[in-house]
Amino acid sequence: QKPGEAVILEQSIDNDGLGQYTFGFKTSDGLIRQEQGVVKNQGTENEALEVRGTITWLGADGKDYSINFVADENGFQPQYTQ
């Protein structure tokens, strides 16, 4: 591993093939991502993918930072936390 390069320490992926999935990973530089998706109103004209998740990382100041988000028919809606 070269300086500044991260490696994946953990990874999980589960897709039920019916419109739901989860995935996540953790890297050696402290990045963590978790995400869940589901197809809402499946089979209708209002069908839409809804994704919810969290991204957490270690800042240069040593503090953890996070973004919780929803992405759906209303767009990407992030909420930043520290």
From Swiss-Prot:
Function, in words: Component of the abdominal endocuticle.
Residue span(s) of domain Chitin-binding type R&R: 18-82
Organism of derivation: Schistocerca gregaria (Desert locust)
Official protein name in the record: Endocuticle structural protein SgAbd-6
GO cellular component term, pick one: chitin-based extracellular matrix
InterPro entries: CHIT_BIND_RR_consensus, Cuticle_Struct_Prot, Insect_cuticle
Pyrrolidone carboxylic acid carried by residues: Q1
Molecular function per GO: structural constituent of chitin-based larval cuticle
UniProt keyword list: Cuticle, Pyrrolidone carboxylic acid
